[in-house]
Amino acid sequence: MTMTPEQAAWFQGTFQRLVDNVDRAVQGKREIVSLVLASMLAEGHVLLEDAPGTGKTSLAKALAATVQGTSTRIQFTPDLLPSDVTGVTIYDQQQHRFEFHKGPIFASIVLADEINRASPKTQSALLEVMEESRVTVDGVTHETGRPFLVIATQNPIEQAGTYKLPEAQLDRFLIKTSIGYPDISVTESILAGASDRNPSAGLSAIITTSAVADMADLGASVHVEPAVLRYVAEIAEATREDSAIRLGVSVRGAIAMIRIAKVWAASQGRHFVLPDDIKALARPVWQHRLLLDAEAEFAGTSSDAVIARVLDAVAAPQARAAA
């Protein structure tokens, strides 16, 4: 069943109410909030590359409060074990049986802070749960539930003692973006309310977690014209053929684009995807999936520059609205 224009209008209104609510706690970052919310509704995960103190924890808590969900924060360190993330089976002496104690990964919104400080083994455990939305221990499967959003963070400045995420694992994040510092006027407003140590505490839930799951299902029903599908495939192919790129956009990356483009279109009140949606999302969806060759890196070429070049080179179709 394809989304109707009436459903698209409802989706847009609800989406904007969610953004407005989160924006009360994370001021001046509506575009980033919209991207993260769209990722959650597309049932993907987010990688934030930011310096400390830019509001990552506030974003996670505010988003959880807005959808009446739970939130956890995992501080990744070199000695963190996979079981510290997923949970552990413990023998209950009174009940005379083994019981699974869920780890912090079982929450609606999980902030995986400084993911690149954990060992590759622990990183892999997290990324496996992100991919499967479940944990299997001793042959028993435990579902994470819906919604399930991991917001992983990396500090772009301090690299000592870190383990770089391999390209195959970076590919599992739906988007990569940065909150960044607020402008002066927003900073002034934040300072005026600095006595409020938990800005998300006063937020009211806009919808329930079950309603979020329904929105995700509705977003997936947005129509995509064959011409737009081909446009995405041509862009992905162009990144793989670019002389500056050693590793271009994979098929997984192209699928990721379609998933979030559907939600993005619905958030704009449309029941169909336009080429402009692809252009608007190209940087956050694809920048972390491109691996530059050594010569291009030495010359100062960035993945953003390659994406811009490819978008200019690939002709966008004249997409028609769905009937």
Protein language model features and the residues they cover:
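P-loop (Walker A) phosphate-binding loop of NTP-binding proteins
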Residues: 51, 85, 153
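AAA+/P-loop NTPase substrate/partner-engagement loops
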Residues: 66-94
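Walker A/P-loop
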Residues: 40-77
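Pre-Walker A (pre-P-loop) alpha-helix and adjacent loop at the N terminus of AAA/AAA+ ATPase modules
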Residues: 8-51
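C-terminal engagement/docking regions of AAA+ P-loop ATPases
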Residues: 1-2, 9, 241-323
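Conserved alpha-helical scaffold flanking the Walker A/P-loop in AAA+ ATPase domains
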Residues: 34-38, 91-111, 140
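Walker B catalytic acidic pair
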Residues: 50, 113-114, 125
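Canonical AAA+ ATPase core
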Residues: 92-97, 118, 122, 130-222, ...
